């Protein structure tokens, strides 16, 4: 009887588990995430879930800070070097063995001299490496963009090389205090420690050579643009994983009720990240709704409006006095923009490189054209993705939290507007923008996005007609605009090859203009 009862109960539990698994799977395929908290367990479930998610978000924030902190890995290197140097100095080596023959052979004075030379050399090398690093930061800020400094600070190879040098210095210093100690009336030579110091010296030489190689490549404009492009595309995949479809339904945020309470910024700064899951779970457990009206990446002033919150249910009302404060704990405002949830910042970094290249001080339009090529890769992916706001609802369909994201037209404007204005005197820059717009239009399935592309094409045409006095320059841009417009107006049309927008098109337009002038003459 007991076994039969256990078997029946086991089958019931298994069926219940399979049913719960199916429910979780169905819920995960819904358009927005759902949060259901039983009333009897609301308190402890909410406390556990929000605490766990907050810890994960806090870990991400700490990890993001540590990746950009230059002192972290060198500090670990110093600690490891001091510890290993002191420990290896206490390891004796039996005289006459094979290991003894491989170890350092010399007097205590020789051992002390080796350790001192290695330590002094590492201090000098660390100073050189720091100087070269600061020089690369200066070049990046003056030649490319000040907003790229964060990318250089997050460069792991530089931090690893500094850690190796710091470890070698600390290791050699840690073994110095044991040289010359007398054991049984004889001088003690830390052969293992001295041999390790020599080995670390050769490792440091290899690290220095690699550092110089890496530094020379890292300050190249192509490497910088590729890093920014890849990081931005990674964020696009994270925020917008689904492809766009022609029958996609666009949700619009609700209007806050009259008794909604404003969510005000606690201090001035850039809206860096929002813990969407935390706020949704908080709203699910408290039966509130929160709506943000500020995009991630926007600058807010202290006391400025971030959003609204109100009570859900049949009898709406203002939330309790502590709900806005609890909600604002999961809205992070900082002194700088980051790429954690802000795609526009990745576009801004690339646009800044183009603007600096188009400035009279540099006058490097080809670099601006390269930036446009990298921007086309990001904008084309954005054109092919569904760009919904981040919405959280419960199983009943009631809104828990709404985080707005910029529209496709906004992303396209960020990538094209300033380059069009500052590059309006260079026809190849404008034709590169038209090449970008034709590639974007090829991936658009939403008619409203095609309208946004057509608007940008019209703005490029107006800039060309206003700025270019030479007929061949104007003809080249207008011809490229006509080809891009054809892609916009005929869905399914492939974008023309790059040769129709670049130097080949420029040469053809110039030759055609000269022939027309000769015939007219």
UniProtKB/Swiss-Prot annotation:
Localization, UniProt: Cell membrane
Annotated stretches, region: Disordered: 1-25
Residue ranges crossing the lipid bilayer per the database entry: 68-88, 114-134, 160-180, 192-212, 290-310, 399-419
UniProt main location, coarse: membrane
Gene Ontology CC terms: cytosol; plasma membrane
UniProt membrane topology term: Multi-pass membrane protein
Keywords, sorted A to Z: Cell membrane, Membrane, Transmembrane, Transmembrane helix
Pfam hit, one: DUF2254
Keyword Cell membrane: yes
Lineage: superkingdom: Bacteria
Name of the protein in its database record: Uncharacterized protein Rv1290c
UniProt source species: Mycobacterium tuberculosis (strain ATCC 25618 / H37Rv)
Highest classification ranks of the organism: Bacteria, Bacillati, Actinomycetota, Actinomycetes, Mycobacteriales
């Amino acid at each position: 009887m007991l076994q039969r009862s256990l078997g029946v109960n086991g089958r019931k539990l298994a069926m219940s588990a399979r049913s719960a698994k199916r429910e979780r799977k169905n819920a995960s395929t819904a358009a927005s995430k759902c949060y259901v908290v039983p009333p009897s367990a609301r308190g402890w479930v909410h406390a556990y879930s929000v605490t766990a998610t907050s810890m994960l978000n806090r870990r991400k924030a700490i990890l993001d800070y540590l990746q950009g902190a230059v002192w972290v890995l060198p500090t670990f290197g110093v600690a490891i070097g001091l510890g290993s140097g002191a420990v290896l100095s206490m390891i004796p080596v039996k005289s006459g063995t094979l290991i003894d023959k491989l170890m350092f052979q010399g007097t205590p004075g020789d051992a002390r001299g080796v350790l001192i030379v290695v330590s002094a050399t590492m201090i000098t090398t660390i100073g050189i490496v720091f100087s070269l690093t600061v020089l690369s930061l200066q070049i990046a800020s003056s030649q490319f963009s000040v907003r790229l400094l964060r990318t250089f600070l997050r460069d792991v190879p530089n931090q690893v090389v500094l850690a190796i040098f710091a470890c070698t210095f600390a290791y050699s210093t840690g073994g110095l205090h044991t040289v010359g100690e007398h054991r049984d009336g004889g001088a003690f030579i830390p052969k293992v420690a001295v041999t390790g110091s020599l080995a670390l010296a050769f490792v440091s030489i290899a690290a220095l050579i690699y550092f110089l190689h890496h530094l020379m490549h890292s300050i190249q404009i192509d490497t910088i643009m590729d890093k920014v492009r890849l990081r931005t595309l990674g964020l696009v995949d994270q925020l917008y994983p689904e492809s766009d479809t022609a029958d996609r339904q666009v949700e619009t945020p609700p209007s806050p009720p009259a008794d909604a309470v404003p969510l005000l910024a606690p201090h001035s700064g850039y809206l860096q990240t929002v813990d969407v899951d935390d706020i949704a779970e908080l709203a699910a457990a408290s039966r509130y709704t929160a709506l943000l009206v500020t995009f991630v990446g926007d600058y807010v002033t202290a006391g400025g409006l971030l959003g609204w919150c109100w009570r859900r249910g049949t009898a709406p009302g203002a939330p309790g006095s502590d709900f806005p404060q609890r909600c604002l704990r999961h809205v992070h405002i900082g002194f700088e923009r980051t790429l954690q949830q802000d795609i526009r910042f990745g576009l801004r970094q690339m646009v800044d490189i183009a603007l600096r290249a188009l400035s009279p001080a540099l006058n490097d339009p080809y670099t601006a054209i390269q930036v446009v090529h990298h921007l086309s890769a990001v904008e084309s992916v954005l054109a092919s993705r569904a760009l919904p706001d981040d919405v959280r609802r419960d199983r009943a369909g009631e809104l828990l939290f709404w985080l707005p994201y910029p529209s496709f037209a906004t992303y396209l404007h960020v990538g094209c507007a300033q380059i069009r204005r500052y590059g309006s005197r260079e026809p190849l820059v404008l034709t590169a923008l038209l090449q970008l717009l034709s590639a974007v239009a090829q991936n658009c399935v939403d008619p409203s996005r095609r309208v946004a592309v057509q608007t940008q094409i019209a703005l490029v045409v107006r800039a060309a007609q206003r700025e270019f006095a030479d007929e061949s320059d104007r003809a080249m841009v207008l011809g490229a605009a006509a080809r891009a417009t054809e892609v916009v107006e005929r869905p399914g049309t492939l974008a023309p090859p790059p040769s129709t927008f670049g130097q080949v098109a420029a040469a053809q337009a110039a030759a055609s203009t000269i022939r027309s002038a000769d015939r007219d003459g």
